[in-house]
Swiss-Prot record:
It comes from Stenotrophomonas maltophilia (strain R551-3). It is an enzyme of class 2 (transferase). The chain crosses the membrane at residues 17-37, 57-77, 92-112, 127-147, 196-216, 222-242, 255-275. Its EC number is 2.5.1.145. GO terms for cellular component: plasma membrane. It is a multi-pass membrane protein. Pathway: Protein modification; lipoprotein biosynthesis (diacylglyceryl transfer). It comes from the Bacteria. Belongs to the Lgt family. It holds the Pfam family LGT. It is found in: Cell inner membrane. This is Phosphatidylglycerol--prolipoprotein diacylglyceryl transferase. InterPro entries: Lgt (IPR001640).
Length: 295
């Protein structure tokens, strides 16, 4: 059954303060990462690091997500606007975050933290990888609620009519008028793939289940990080075929998107890590010892 998107992106208004669902999804993602990370620390999945050390790591990773995500968006998707007005970088309330930029931010944070605590960088990355997918899933749900990053037209019964995705002059009509037209079936031809939910399922739920299961037992170094990079790259590349290209423009061949181009290095990197893991040592869980100074 085709759905008419009429969800208010603002979850709560407190006078001049507006709490957006997208922000709540970020909070849920960070909360999930904190809870899951503490469980993995208690199970000895990052030897020598206790709960305090993990909280320190997560703090820097969160900074990497936000700063890297915003900077990445401006560089990858809005470079012209950024060069014209660099202050746009700080207008986070206008939206605009890049997963690939956020990933680079997390990598930088984990590299710095690992070096500070004299831990193998990829042990840290393997530890963090299973904590990320649920946050990705929540973020894509936030995209859906905010009616952004929608897909291409579909005649499937699961399509969604996004008012902001309607062509002119329909996108100028008031909400009540659009609902009345939708009730007659007049807008069904403009139903789109809910690509945000596809990504929430694949990059969120499926990746979490796989990575959590693999990381819950002894495994070779590089394996979990390699699976993360490979799976995200493949899932993102695939969903981009039914998702509208950024700014409505293809990069090449009238089908290749910027998101697909940015995903290709991830796929290659994931494959390299999986090959490296075959000769890497097997990591065994070790319960944290606060006295070791990794706090």
């Amino acid at each position: 059954m085709i759905y008419f998107h009429d969800i208010d992106p603002i979850a709560l208004s407190l006078g001049p303060i507006k709490v957006h669902w997208y922000g709540i999804m970020y909070l849920l993602g960070f909360t999930a990462a904190w809870l899951l990370g503490r469980k993995r620390i208690a199970d000895g999945r990052l030897p020598g690091v206790d709960a305090n050390g993990f909280s320190d790591l997560l703090f820097y990773a969160m900074l990497g997500v936000v700063l890297g995500g915003r900077i990445g968006y401006m560089l990858f998707y809005a470079l012209g606007d950024f060069l014209h007005n660099p202050l746009l970088l700080f207008k986070v309330w206008d939206g605009g975050m890049s997963f690939h930029g956020g990933l680079l931010g997390v990598i930088a944070a984990c590299w710095w933290w690992s070096r500070k605590h004299k831990l193998h960088f990829f042990d840290t990355m393997d530890f963090m990888a299973p904590l990320v997918p649920l946050g990705l899933g929540f973020g894509r749900i936030g995209n859906f609620i905010g009616a952004e990053l929608w897909g291409k037209y579909t005649d499937g019964s699961w399509g969604v009519v996004f008012p902001s995705g309607l062509p002119a002059p329909l996108n100028q009509l008031d909400h009540a008028t659009l609902q009345a037209q939708f009730a007659t079936g007049a807008l069904n031809q403009f139903a789109r793939h809910p690509s945000q939910l596809y990504e929430a399922l694949l990059e969120g739920l499926v990746m979490f289940v796989v990575l959590w299961a693999v990381s819950a037992k002894p495994r070779h170094r590089y394996l979990v990080g390699g699976l993360f990079a490979l799976m995200y790259g493949l899932f993102r590349f695939a969903v981009e075929f039914v998702r509208m290209p950024d700014n409505g423009v293809y990069v090449a061949f009238d089908w290749l998107t910027r998101g697909q181009i940015l995903s290709l290095p991830l796929i290659a990197f994931g494959l390299v890590l999986l090959v490296m893991s075959r000769r890497a040592p097997v990591l065994q869980p070790q319960l944290p010892v606060a006295a070791e100074g990794k706090a």
